[in-house]
Regions:
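A contiguous strand-loop segment
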Residues: 25-152, 172-305, 309-313
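Substrate-recognition/cap regions that form aromatic- and gly/pro-loop-enriched pockets
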Residues: 339-471
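Hydrophobic core
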Residues: 12-20
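Glycine-rich, aromatic-lined ligand/substrate-binding cores of catalytic
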Residues: 247-381, 385
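Histidine-centered catalytic/metal-binding microenvironments
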Residues: 446-537
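Short, well-ordered beta-strand elements within core beta-sheets of diverse protein domains
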Residues: 156-162
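Bacterial N-terminal signal peptides that target proteins for export
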Residues: 1-9
């Protein structure tokens, strides 16, 4: 690759590092033995108030294509006609170019691209660390001036373009970071391909590690690095940057004698409920016998990196965890002043007091479900929905499909667009907050039955596609998957358009069908009212 513009990257890196730090995401990587149907999963809730809303299909590029390496190529960018039209937005900078050495894979492109036509899927969680602690200051000094040319957006794009398996993606991304360097905050990238699930953590400079998720286990991360063990000479299960220990010793990050723990060495993270409490509720949902303590400081350092679930999981199970706001615990965000009289879990103020997995600022949620028993064209399934998980839906997308409905490529946050998929859900989300306790029942009535049917339908459609592919009718199979996916996406768009009308009619001004008498406030609100302002219902 050409490095003529790398000097520019370093000059501007300090300004750009903060851009990715906006994100605040929760991810799961699920081994095939931990799921009911033997699929692997890689998930991502893209939680931010500034992320791009749109999703595109990036077509395969033939061998010999000139490919740009772009830093921060998301804000205001337009990939609708990429690569014929290269619009990298207001911040995007081309720092390098290379020539493709293979026909690249088609993939689903978003703020963080997530699925290709081979069934390789990934997500990410930006990792914070304590920059003011003694270890944090050493980390800052160690990585200062070592900014490279790859950020997380570009690394995921290029891996999906060029890799077919999770292991290949780990090796490919690791080689790029080793040679060309990292530019951005530390990241935790979860990856799966139907056979294996991996976690790839990159900390800065040329330093990274990757661990395979045991087949019977699940990994979860919430904005902090979590690979808390180190294994040498086992590349089938653990890989890392060359000279990683030497780098740690030379920069005073490790004494060379104690246990070498990558996440605490390169991304030191003190007890902070913002992240640890999300991980706690997720892991306890998967295995209640873990007996993890969400309050005692520093015990989270000993939390398991991987959890074997008490019961094998489904997509619905993971979706339910994404909708969690600490119900049934002392941290329930609806049982606070921010929950209001109707138990609203989506008040923006709650993120600063009790950060839940379910968040008002979730741009989109994706749950990749990849089953290696199916042909590539049929296995590359990802479940997608815009907005807060508790009120959104999931619709099936395939990395192999040949088109997307128009509403996927529309929408910006500042301008209401009734034809945008994100805005379509955002209206429902906002209206549900008027009287959440009642409105969520309307959401469930419109959504849950359809999703149950859809899970079964999609599995059946995949089997039909597999049969067609087995008969040599691959184009026919892909056309069927495309038509089915687009039909479901349009169905959900119409359903939520109608649901918005229902919510507005039912709960305008907090009433129920225009009736303000007999409104049911939460017990918390009634008790608060009685103690602070006198009983008022």
């Amino acid at each position: 690759m050409k490095k003529a513009t790398k000097v520019l990257a370093i000059a501007l890196a300090i300004m750009l590092v903060a851009v990715q730090g906006i994100a605040a995401c929760t991810v799961f990587a699920v081994g095939k033995g931990a799921t009911v149907d033997g699929s692997t999963m890689a998930t991502h809730s893209c939680d931010s108030t500034s992320d791009d809303l749109r999703v595109w299909l990036i077509p395969s590029m033939p061998e010999g294509t000139e490919r740009d390496v772009v830093l921060d190529g998301r804000a205001g960018a337009d990939y609708s006609n990429f690569p014929e039209v290269k619009d990298y937005g207001k911040n995007g900078m081309v720092l390098d170019t290379y020539t493709t050495t293979r026909d690249t894979n088609q993939y689903l492109h978003a703020m963080y691209s997530f699925m290709n036509e081979k069934g390789l899927a990934m997500g990410e969680s930006t990792c914070s660390y304590d920059r003011n602690s003694e270890q944090g200051k050493k980390v800052r000094a160690a990585f200062d001036g070592k900014e490279g040319i790859y950020d997380c957006y570009m690394l995921q794009d290029i891996a999906l373009e060029n890799c077919d398996t999770a292991r290949e993606a780990v090796e490919f991304m690791g080689a790029l970071v080793t040679e060309y360097g990292w530019n951005g905050a530390a990241e935790c990238i979860d990856i799966c391909d139907g056979n294996e699930a991996w976690v790839f953590e990159v900390y800065g400079g040329n330093i990274w590690v990757a661990a395979r998720v045991p087949d019977d286990s699940i990994f979860v991360a919430a904005n902090r690095a979590r690979i808390n063990f180190f294994v040498e000479n086992d590349p089938d299960n653990y890989q890392y940057a060359p000279g990683i220990k030497e780098f740690a010793i030379e920069n005073g990050l490790w004494d060379g004698q104690s246990d070498f723990i990558p996440c605490f060495t390169f991304a030191p993270y003190p007890y902070r409920p913002y992240s640890t409490r999300r991980e706690w509720v997720a892991m306890m949902s998967l295995d209640p016998t873990l007996n993890l303590d969400p309050e005692e400081k520093d015990t989270d350092r000993n939390w398991p990196c991987f959890v074997k679930p008490q019961n094998k999981v489904t997509v619905q199970d993971i979706f339910n965890i994404y909708g969690n706001y600490y119900q049934g615990t002392e941290y329930d965000v609806t049982k606070s002043i921010w929950g209001g009289q109707f138990g609203d879990p989506l008040n923006p103020a709650q993120d600063f007091t009790q950060r839940a997995i379910n968040s008002y600022r979730c741009t989109y949620l994706q749950i990749a479900q990849v089953n290696a028993s199916l042909p590539e064209e049929a296995r590359c399934l990802v479940w997608f929905g815009w907005g807060a998980p508790s009120v959104t839906y999931l619709t099936p997308l395939f990395g192999s499909q040949t088109s997307l409905p128009e509403h996927f490529g529309r929408g910006v946050r500042a301008d209401y667009d009734r034809e945008s998929g994100w805005w379509n859900e955002a209206v429902v989300q906002q209206l549900s907050r008027i009287n959440y306790t009642a409105a969520i029942e309307d959401v469930k009535a419109a959504r849950d039955g359809k999703m149950t049917v859809q899970f079964a339908q999609t599995a059946a459609i995949q089997e039909v596609a597999a049969s067609l592919i087995g008969m040599g009718k691959t184009e026919e199979a892909v056309a069927m998957l495309t038509n089915y996916s687009n039909m479901q996406s349009k169905m959900w768009f119409n359903t939520y358009e109608e649901l918005a009308d229902t919510l507005l009619s039912n709960y305008m001004q907090g009433s129920v069908k225009g009736n303000t008498w007999g409104l049911k406030y939460t017990d918390f609100w009634n008790e608060l009212s009685a103690s602070e302002w006198g009983q008022y219902k």
